[in-house]
Amino acid sequence: IEFVKRYNNLEFNDAIRQLASEYGIEMEENRGYGEDLEIYYNINRDAALFFYKAFTEKANKGYSYMKRRGIRPEILKKFGIGYADESWNSLYEHLTQKGYPVDKLIEVGLVSESKGRYYDKFRNRVIFPIINTAGKVIGFGGRAIDPSDNPKYLNSPESKVFRKKNNLYGLNLSRASVGKEGFIILVEGYMDTISLYQGGITNVVASLGTALTENQSHLIKRYTKDVVLSYDSDSAGVAAALRGMEILHNDGLKVRIIKISGG
């Protein structure tokens, strides 16, 4: 269990579930923690499906934006890219109709409340589901489509199933390639990851922002000890690369740096 937990970056209960699933063992959940986690995973899964359908079933600003960025349909599907429309509460209505309690929707950061009214946290944004190595949707990133909307990127808050410092975007897709290539390419963001993946460079992950953490370094070390840092070439990216290099070196990893333009 400990090996599965560490190798797949899972909580104890999730490691047990994964082993049970692989070996065809039926589990009877203890009341409390296990059930609580499962509802978060289910909420995120259904939200991801809702966003994906909005992105794929009819013309929308999100799909047009990604098309302008040159991302091919098969890559969009691979990463489960979605679209949060401009409605104030379409996701809220969808999920509450499925019977999910509002307090859980607020906890995972999909819904906010103001003066007794509930509204969607992500609106008019391209949605990037964050998926762990067990295939569970644990959070989301949302990229503003309108240049006047701030912040440019909106991410899920910390929750019982999402700890930003413990996860790497795209690792669910890239870990086999990392093992094959013998090294990992670490970039800043969602679009960096997707663009490189589309170009055939599939041993790539993102640190979910500019600040690499020690836990993320430990996670990388489970798969390889050779890291190529490819952060943006602006001042923030350079500073982050230097901080990241120090963290990785202190963890016993070999680090190379290459510069990319963009953001």
Language-model-derived ranges and their functions:
Residues 33-35, 39, 44-46, 87-227, ...:
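Phosphate-handling DNA/RNA-contact segment within nucleic-acid enzymes
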